[in-house]
Amino acid sequence: MRIHFLLFALLFLFLMPVPGNGGIINMLQKSYCKIRKGRCALLGCLPKEEQIGSCSVSGRKCCRKKK
């Protein structure tokens, strides 16, 4: 019976999300950026673009062409 508890605990640890990797939040922010006609930039927006939001918790920026 102890082996079942140990296996369950190990399975739980491996399936737990990594801290700082907000998978669902990142996906929603990325989708919202695409809906607003933007793109996700890794470092920053290009000179002819403006920042309209963020694409992830880690700091990617959502950019689109200036109007």
Swiss-Prot record:
UniProt subcellular location: Secreted
Pfam annotation, one family: Defensin_beta
GO molecular-function term, one example from the UniProt record: CCR6 chemokine receptor binding
Keywords of this entry: Antibiotic, Antimicrobial, Defensin, Disulfide bond, Secreted, Signal
Disulfide bonding pattern of the chain: C33-C62, C40-C55, C45-C63
Any one GO cellular component localisation term in the record: extracellular space
Gene3D superfamilies tied to this protein: Antimicrobial Peptide, Beta-defensin 2, Chain A (3.10.360.10)
Signal peptide stretch: 1-22
GO biological process: cell chemotaxis; defense response to bacterium
Membership in a protein family: Belongs to the beta-defensin family.
Function as written in the Swiss-Prot or TrEMBL entry: Exhibits antimicrobial activity against Gram-positive and Gram-negative bacteria.
UniProt protein name: Beta-defensin 103A
